[in-house]
Each structure stands twice: as C-alpha cells, then as structure tokens.
C-alpha cells in the first residue's frame, strides 16, 4: 500500500479512530494524524500508521521471520476453514451492508485482508503491536487500514466498531466493550485440544505442559459474553518440507525451544483443531 492509498482510507474512516494517549479524535494534517491534544503520528510511506511509537520493537518475539513463516502457512490454505467460518458468520449478519470490523492482533493481515475483499462495503482495520507484522500486511494491496497499536489501549473511537475479530490472541474484554457499538459482537478463535499436536509432541521436552485444554479460556469467555454461535475446525493435513519448517518457526510454542531443535525437526502432517466463537459481550464482567 502506498501513502496515497493510505490517505484515502483515512479520509473515509478517520472518525473510527481516537488518540491512544488522550482519547480525542484525529484530524488529517498533511501526512500526519493530529489530535486536539496535539499528539501527532506520522503516516508511514509504506502504508501504515504507527500509533504505538513508544513500544520497543527490538524486544518483540513476533518478528519478520515469524511472519514470513506465517504467510507461507496461511497462503497455503491451512487456515482457510477458519476464514470461511468467520466469513459465514459475518455474511449471515451483514450480507452486503456496510459494517466496521477491527482485527485485533492481525499479524501479517491474512484475515483482515481476505475479509475486506469478501465484504467490500465494510471498513476493516488491522491492529497489531508488532511493526514487522504490520509491515508485512501493508506490503500487499488492499483497502485495510493498518495500524501498529497496543491492543490494551487501541486507537479506536468508543462505540464505533460492529465486530472485533480476535484470532489466537489474548482478549482484552473491557477494551472490546469500549470500542464495540451497542449490540456489537466479538468473533474469537481459540485452540482446541488437538491443535498443532504434532508440534507439541516434537517439542515436548522443552514445554511446560504435555497437553492443551481451552477450558480456562472458555470459562473466562463465558463470564464476559453470551455465546451465540460456535463452529469447530478439526482436520489433519500432510506437509511439505517447506510447510513443516514454516509451522515450526511460526508457533509461539517454539519460543522456549532451542533453535537447533526447531531447525532439525521435521513434521509429516499437522492437525488444526480450533473453535470459532461468535458472542456478544455482557455490559460488565459477571
């Protein structure tokens, strides 16, 4: 995305944003966003806005190599059933009508970009604290507004978002409540028991848990939201050598695993087991 395209998107969707430091609305001043409190954020020539310039990117584990591996996996179609499930939920509710979707923790932008293509009337915002992720997202053409942003204090105006999409990212329910419109919804994608079980088995000596359960995540979700719909994705697929390497490099399970182990492990297949959950947040946590 170039600067001209970014400016065009901002001219249309500027009312959806708010300054992350003071909460006031933005105006577009040249190639910068400026709020009434005089906080200023420059538009990057590569097609995004960094609204978390204070974040130390050098300590970010979600780096360019990880997002390159994720792109290999995602563009190979492994997560297409998840995208299809999210798309069907949005289609049932909005059809061809306009709506605002915020992809919280968008990474390299696979879901946000794909949904913007499927729903051209929608305003889609992709947010991630990793600049490398947003850089990877902004390299590809499209109509998504890409923002480097802290998800605990996102630069979104209160009550302006129809749907928050949260894919494999820790949820900040109080924040989601603030940015969602009345009646707005959260679509949350969480792992289930067999998710990437081949990687867990290969890395087992270096992991704290032998198995995974989403029980605590679901319990926490149920305290904050009414579950409206749930779809399960469960499939095991063969891998090429390149795809095996990409899966091993992209998962946070590998953060605690020695690089030598990650580089010498090869997987013949991978299991994807996820829950796609559409829900409406309670007015407050119970």
Which stretches of residues belong to each language-model region?
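Conserved SAM-binding strand-loop segment of SAM-dependent methyltransferases
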Residues: 142-154
């Amino acid at each position: 995305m170039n600067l001209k395209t970014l400016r065009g998107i901002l001219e249309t969707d500027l009312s959806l944003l708010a300054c992350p430091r003071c909460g006031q609305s933005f105006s577009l001043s040249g190639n910068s966003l400026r709020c009434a409190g005089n906080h200023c954020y420059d538009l990057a020539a590569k097609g995004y806005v960094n609204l978390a310039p204070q974040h130390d990117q050098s300590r970010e584990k979600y780096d360019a190599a990880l997002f390159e591996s994720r792109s290999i996996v995602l563009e190979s179609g492994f997560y297409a059933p998840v995208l299809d499930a999210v798309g069907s939920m949005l289609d049932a509710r909005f059809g061809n009508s306009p709506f605002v979707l915020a992809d919280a923790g968008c990474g390299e932008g696979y879901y946000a970009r794909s949904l913007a293509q499927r729903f051209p009337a929608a305003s889609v915002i992709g947010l991630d604290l990793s600049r490398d992720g947003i850089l990877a997202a902004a390299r590809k053409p499209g109509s998504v507004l890409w923002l480097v942003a802290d998800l605990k204090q996102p630069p979104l105006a209160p009550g302006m978002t129809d749907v928050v999409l949260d894919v494999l990212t820790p949820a900040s329910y109080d924040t989601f409540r603030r940015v969602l419109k009345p009646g707005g919804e959260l679509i949350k994608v969480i792992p289930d028991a067999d998710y990437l079980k081949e990687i867990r088995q290969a890395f087992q000596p270096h992991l704290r848990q032998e198995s995974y359960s989403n029980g605590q995540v679901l319990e926490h979700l149920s305290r904050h939201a009414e579950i409206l719909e749930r779809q399960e994705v469960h499939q095991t697929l063969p891998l090429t050598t390149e795809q095996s390497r990409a899966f091993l490099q992209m998962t946070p399970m590998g953060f605690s695993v020695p690089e030598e182990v990650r580089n010498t492990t090869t997987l013949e297949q991978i299991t994807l087991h996820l829950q796609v959950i559409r829900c409406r947040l309670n007015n407050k946590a119970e």
